[in-house]
Design a protein with these regions (language model features):
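Helix-loop boundary and gating motifs at the non-cytosolic
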Residues: 1-52, 232-265, 275-276, 348
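Juxtamembrane intracellular "pre-TM" segments in multi-pass secondary transporters
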Residues: 1-3, 204-237, 263-268
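Central cavity-lining transmembrane alpha-helices of secondary-active solute carriers
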Residues: 42-63, 278-294
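Multi-pass alpha-helical transporter architecture, strongest
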Residues: 57, 86-91, 192-205, 407, ...
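Cytoplasmic membrane-interface "Motif A"-like loop-to-helix N-cap segments
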Residues: 63-77, 299-311
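C-terminal ends and interior cores of transmembrane alpha-helices
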Residues: 77-107, 312-326
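Cytoplasmic helix-loop-helix junction between adjacent transmembrane helices
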Residues: 118-156
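A membrane-interface helix-boundary motif in multi-pass transporters
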Residues: 170-191, 389-425
């Protein structure tokens, strides 16, 4: 029975993360094709905006009324249906454009597509926490230790994410175009989401626990703002927001950047230029491995140095993209993806652990909510919108013939964009080194 429960949760995690992996890193390539390249930042910023309040709201729904599993199914149904609708709309526009002899970009409605996308991500983002809560509840009811038994199950979520990325990269339309450039990524994401809805109803029921009536202020992390009275905690949260700026930049712009080498004659036939999503998937593999380094790093270096390593890793992440190409410089793109494991994990997970160690009592959950608000909410939103302005300033859209088919790429001075991002991360790292002082091991917890 035990292995059976774990296997069922593994399947749930594979589906949960395959939904996101289908479009998160390749959506930029599609948006460029339909004339929305200059608006890539808006799509990724929307994920940050809805992350500010939707997970908290749906968490309250789960706690007070439906429970984690049913709320997960409800959210996935709305998210999956909206994403499927976005994909089917995009497919209909493409068919209409071909019939009318027009370009897809000339017929594409940004407001309609963006509305469907927004509904989808608004209800998908809460499912990340809800799927974790459902897994915790099922494991605990069956006598498992969540700290020990959940991480190996969660790893399969990353496997699902990577599998979706590879499907988008290597599957092609009848015309030979990779799914990373087409609407198929949204349809596949929506279908997987609806499959997960059905799967949720087969999961074991979780006994409803007595709730402590967490308020919306607590769920959003707003009640934890009193922690700003502690100078070093305030500095930590401010720098969490400043580094959060970097989190979604490469998700939005890495694949359009790598793909643009197809528009340069000297790189047009290189494997890397044609397989941007596959190259980028190395980042997700590195992220999984990076988690394993955290316990050692935290013990060896302490929170300040681990966070500093993460910031310097972001400098390398961006700088290597600025130096690399898909020819002889492809190793720099690969190294950048490997570095991502340290850049992401050493910041996100170590930061969360630090918040947990420094707080106690009723403020602990709110403090975690505040950390998420500062990083994935405010920081990521500001970061993607700022990146959009920078990329739009230094690049332009250009139509190129690839294997007899018109393709649109974002051409221009990409290197300067990456150097600006790297410079920003370096300035943040230097200021963090100067201003943040790690508390003593015996420092009292904040309440």
């Amino acid at each position: 029975m035990g292995k059976h429960i774990k296997l069922r949760l593994i399947v749930m995690n594979i589906l949960q993360w395959a939904i996101w992996g289908a479009y998160l890193t390749s959506m930029g390539n599609y948006l460029v094709q339909v004339g929305l390249g200059p608006k890539i930042g808006l799509f990724y910023a929307m994920q940050g905006i809805v992350s500010i309040f939707m997970p908290a709201l749906m968490g309250i729904v789960a706690d007070k009324w439906l429970g984690a599993t049913k709320t997960l199914a409800l959210c996935q149904f709305i998210a999956g249906a909206a994403m499927l609708g976005a994909g089917l709309y995009a497919a209909s526009v493409e068919s209409g454009a071909i019939a009318a002899g027009m370009k897809v970009a000339e017929m594409f409605s940004f407001p309609l597509f963006m509305s469907l996308y927004t509904i989808s991500v608004a209800f998908y983002m809460p499912t990340i926490a809800l799927s974790n809560s459902a897994a915790y509840g099922i494991l605990e009811q069956n006598g498992y230790d969540t700290v020990k038994d959940f991480p190996p199950i969660r790893v399969f979520g990353t496997v699902g994410f990577i599998a979706s990325m590879w499907i988008m990269n290597f599957c092609k339309t009848s015309a030979g175009t990779s799914f990373q450039f087409t609407y198929h990524q949204f349809i596949i994401s929506g279908v997987i989401g609806l499959v997960l809805v059905l799967y949720c109803f087969t999961l074991p029921k979780i006994k409803k626990a007595e709730t402590q009536g967490q308020s919306l202020m607590d769920a959003l992390g707003l009640s934890a703002f009193k922690l700003f009275r502690d100078k070093q905690m305030a500095i930590f949260f401010i720098f969490s927001m400043l580094l959060g700026v970097a989190l979604q930049i490469t998700n939005g712009y890495a694949t359009p950047f790598i793909s643009h080498f197809q528009g340069l004659p000297e790189f047009a036939e290189s494997w890397g230029a044609k397989n941007a999503t596959a190259i980028y998937s190395i980042s997700q593999i590195a992220e999984t491995l990076g988690i394993l380094l955290i316990p050692f790093a935290m013990k060896k270096f302490g929170i300040k140095n681990v966070m500093l390593i993460a910031m310097l890793a972001w400098v390398l992440r961006f700088g290597l993209f600025g130096l690399g190409d898909t020819g002889s410089g492809v190793w720099m793109l690969i190294l950048s993806c490997i570095v991502y494991g340290v850049a992401f994990d050493f910041f996100n997970i170590s930061g969360s652990l630090y918040v947990n160690e420094r707080t106690s009592g009723s403020v602990q959950n709110s403090a975690q909510g505040l950390f998420m608000l500062m990083t994935n909410g405010i920081g990521a939103t500001v970061g993607t919108l700022s990146a959009q302005a920078i990329v739009n300033h230094f690049t332009y859209s250009e139509t190129v013939m690839v294997n007899g088919e018109e393709m649109v790429f974002t051409m221009g001075d990409w290197s300067t964009c990456w150097y600006i991002f790297a410079g920003y991360a370096l300035v943040v790292a230097i200021l963090f080194f100067i201003l943040f002082k790690a508390p003593a091991k015996d420092a009292p917890k904040l309440v």
